Amino acid sequence: MGKIVRVTGPLVVADEMRGSRMYEVVRVGELGLIGEIIRLEGDKAVIQVYEETAGIKPGEPVMGTGASLSVELGPGLLTSIYDGIQRPLEILRSQSGDFIGRGLTAPALSRDKKWHFTPKVKVGDKVVGGDIIGVVPETSIIEHKIMIPPEIEGEIIEIVGEGDYTIEEVIAKVKAPNGEIKEVRMYQRWPVRMKRPYKQKLPPEVPLVTGQRTIDTFFPQAKGGTAAIPGPFGSGKTVTQHQLAKWSDAEVVVYIGCGERGNEMTDVLEEFPKLKDPRTGKPLMERTVLIANTSNMPVAAREASIYTGITIAEYFRDMGYNVALMADSTSRWAEALREISGRLEEMPGEEGYPAYLASKVAEFYERAGRVRTLGSDDRIGSVSVIGAVSPPGGDLSDPVVQNTLRVVKVFWALDADLARRRHFPAINWLTSYSLYVDSIKDWWQNNVDPEWKAMRDEAMALLQKESELEEIVRIVGPDALPEREKAILLVARMLREDYLQQDAFHEVDTYCLPKKQVTMMRVILNFYRHTMRAIDAGIPVEEIAKLPVREEIGRMKYNPNIEEIAVLMEKTKEQFEELFKKYGE
C-alpha cells in the first residue's frame, strides 16, 4: 500500500511502493481507479491510470493487486463488447447508465451463465499445455475449444462428464510429474504484454481472401500477415476495415476501435448483427469480439486496448482458428504513447513521439503470424493484423507511418484524390505494394487459376503504362497519341472502372469470389488482345470504343453468375470479327 504524491493528467506518482512490480495493476485513490505501474524508482512508482483522474489528490491511498494487467480467456468472448481493459460495456451500462462511472469493474466473462461442455479426454490420458480437453458450442458458428493452460502438463486424474457448467467450476484435474495436482477451469487468465507461446512459426503461404478485387488480385494479404492502411481523413480507412472485417475468410474477427470516433464503433454495432456471414449465413457478430476504446475515453487505455485485442486473437489462434485483427487506428495509440512519454519527461524523438516508438510498433506487429500451436495434435492457426494509420493531413512521412512500413509486408495506400473522384476502395495501385505475392501465388495457381500471376502482372503493367501516358495527355491531349497508346488508355480505364472500383454497398459487388475475380480479369485482358489485333489491322480506337460488349463488361461486376461473365469472351470475339469484316470490305 502506498500514497499519492503527484498527479499529472493520466499519470500518478505514488510513494511507499516498495515491493511492487513493473506492469502490476493497482487501484488508485479513494475511488479505486484502475492503473498500471509503468516505472519504478526507489520506492516511488509511476502509474498510468486507465480512467479519468480529475478529483484525485496527493495523500490518497494506492493499493497493489499483485497481478499484472491480464485478460480472461474463455467461453463468452465472442459477441462481447469490451473497453480497452476488457471491462464488458453492456454490464457497466446496466450498473451506471450510458456513461461509465469511475472505479467500476465487472468480470469480463459471465460467472453465472452455464455452457454445454463435451469432454474430449478421459481419466489416465497424458496431456501437455495447449491440448484440447473438451469443446463448448459458444455460438452457432464457432466451437470454443477448452485448452490446457500452456504451463500445465501431466496426467488427467479427474474430468467431468458432458453437461452444463459455469466457467468457475473445475472441469478437470491434472497430476503434474512432480505429484502436484492442478485444477483446470473453462477459462484462463493471461498477461496482455506477454506473447502466448506456440511450437513453430510457419511461412505465410495461404492468402486471406477478402473478396475485394484490388486487395486479392494486386496487393494480397496472407493469413498470418501484417498490413497497414494509411490515408488522410475521408479516404475510406474505416470502410475498408469494415469490409475486411465483414468478408475476409478468417473464422474469428477481433475489431479494436482505438481512439476513433464513437459513431464509427456504433456503425459496427448496428451493422454486424444484421449482416450475414457469406460462408455460414449466420450473423457476423457471432464470430466477432469488439473492443471499443473511443476518442473520448481516457488516453492511457488506448495503449492497453491494442494488447488486449491481440491477446484475445492469439487465444483463438491457439485453438487452430484463423483470426483477423483490425486496429483502427494505430496512430491514436502512438499519440497515447507520446502523451504518456511527455508526462514522464522523457527525451522526445521525431515529432515528439518517444524514441522507442519503432520498437513498440514492431512488438505489436510481431505478434501476428501463422503458427503450429502448442499441444500434441497438429493444429495450425493464424493471426493476421491489419492496422489503419491516420497521419495528420495524410502525410506519409509521419513517424508512425514510417515505423509501421518498416515492419509490415503489405501497404495499401489510400488516396484522397481517388476518394474525391468517388473511386472506392481508394487504394492507389501505383504506390501500394504487397510482399506476399510470390509466397501465395502457388495457392492461387493450384486452387483458382494457373494463369493468375501472369494475368495480374499484365494488368499491372497496363496500369503503369497508363500513368506514364497521362503525363503526355496532360500536355498535348489524347488525340495526339498514336492509336496503340489510345488503346492502352481505353483498356486501362476499363480495368480501373470495371475491375478495381467496387461498391461496398451493392449486395452483389460488395464481395467478389476469387473465381469471379479471375474470370473478370480474363474478360478484360481478352478484350485488350482483340483490340491490339484490330489496331494492327488499321481499325481506329473510336470504333472499338463503340462496341456493345464494352457496356456489358462494365456491368459484369453486378452479375453473380460466373458462367454468364465467361460468355463475354465469346461475345467479344464475335463483335471484333464483325468489325474486321466491316473494315475488310
Swiss-Prot record:
PROSITE patterns: ATPASE_ALPHA_BETA. Its main location: membrane. Its EC number is 7.1.2.2. SMART domains: AAA. The keyword ATP-binding applies. It is found in: Cell membrane. The keyword Membrane applies. It catalyses: ATP + H2O + 4 H(+)(in) = ADP + phosphate + 5 H(+)(out). One of its GO terms (molecular function) is proton-transporting ATPase activity, rotational mechanism. GO terms for biological process: proton motive force-driven plasma membrane ATP synthesis. It is a peripheral membrane protein. GO terms for cellular component: plasma membrane; proton-transporting two-sector ATPase complex, catalytic domain. Keywords: ATP synthesis, ATP-binding, Cell membrane, Hydrogen ion transport, Ion transport, Membrane, Nucleotide-binding, Translocase, Transport. ATP binds at G231, P232, F233, G234, S235, G236, K237, T238. Belongs to the ATPase alpha/beta chains family. Component of the A-type ATP synthase that produces ATP from ADP in the presence of a proton gradient across the membrane. The A chain is the catalytic subunit. Has multiple subunits with at least A(3), B(3), C, D, E, F, H, I and proteolipid K(x). This is A-type ATP synthase subunit A. It comes from Thermococcus sibiricus (strain DSM 12597 / MM 739). The gene is atpA.
